Design a protein with these regions (language model features):
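Extreme N-terminal tail/first-helix region
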Residues: 1-23
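Charged, gly/pro-rich active-site loop segments
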Residues: 1-9, 83-142
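Anion-coordinating catalytic cores for phosphoryl-, nucleotidyl-, and glycosidic chemistry
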Residues: 10, 19, 62-65, 75-77
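Short Pro/Gly-enriched beta-strand edge/turn motifs at strand-loop
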Residues: 12-13, 24-29, 126-127
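Short beta-strand segments
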Residues: 25-59, 75-76
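Short acidic (Asp/Glu) patches
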Residues: 56-61, 76-84, 126-131
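Helix-adjacent hinge/juxtasegments
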Residues: 65-68, 74-92
């Protein structure tokens, strides 16, 4: 993967700042190489555990088909966007991550990531979280 340097160095975050932005976000846009090489982007909830970003979806679908063909992805998170009308601009707090996607097959890791994802979406009681995991985990891909 060839990484181009940012044009606006004054707006580039450190790796630690980028991780902090990822940690406070709840959704982003996953971009994959779709049919015929066309880009396909879809908004998704996510969670971060360690150095990994986990996304969840159904067991089958277009994005999983695309990832099976070409695992190169881009994930973009925007946590703030402030329009500055006087300067005809917008100030963003965002992170763009390039990487390779893979389906999580280890059940323990899958359940931990799904539990973490539930936690990022708000205050959920342990009982509701357990009910959700029992009911939906088997139909969820991470």
């Amino acid at each position: 993967m060839t990484e181009r340097p940012m044009r606006r160095k004054d707006r580039q975050f450190s790796a630690a700042d980028a991780r902090a932005i990822l940690a406070k976000g709840t959704h982003g846009v996953l971009s994959v190489v779709g049919d015929g090489g066309w880009p396909y982007a879809v908004p998704m909830n996510y969670t971060v555990m360690g150095t990994q970003i986990y996304l969840h979806c159904a067991r089958a679908g277009y994005k999983l088909d695309a990832i099976a063909r070409d695992d190169r992805v881009c994930f973009t998170v925007v946590t703030q966007a402030q329009v500055i009308p006087a300067h005809i601009t917008t100030l963003y707090e965002s992170v763009v991550v390039l990487g390779r996607a893979q389906v999580v097959t280890a059940e323990e890791e899958r359940l931990a990531a799904l539990g973490s994802l539930i936690d990022t979406l708000g205050d959920v009681t342990p009982e509701i979280k357990a009910q959700y995991l029992a009911k939906k985990a088997k139909n969820t891909t991470l």
